[in-house]
Amino acid sequence: MSPALAHHSNAQRAAAAAGIVARAGRRWGLLPYQVVVAASIAANAVLRQGKSAAGAVAAARRAARAQAGAA
């Protein structure tokens, strides 16, 4: 885990993951509504599944790549 996120609550980690995905979504080629969905999925992965922020972002990125490949 990143030292910057080591002493933060799950809610703060979820917000960080959602923010990272939201900023990176356009680079990944996502449409605006897809960015919102991906950020929400990343936040839920942290809150409900206990994933790390980095793991949640990686999962969102994999999903974005898979969707882009299917189009």
Region spans (language model):
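Long, non-catalytic architectural segments outside compact domain cores
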Residues: 2-6
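Amphipathic alpha-helical segments in structured regions that serve as interaction surfaces
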Residues: 7-27, 33-47, 53-68
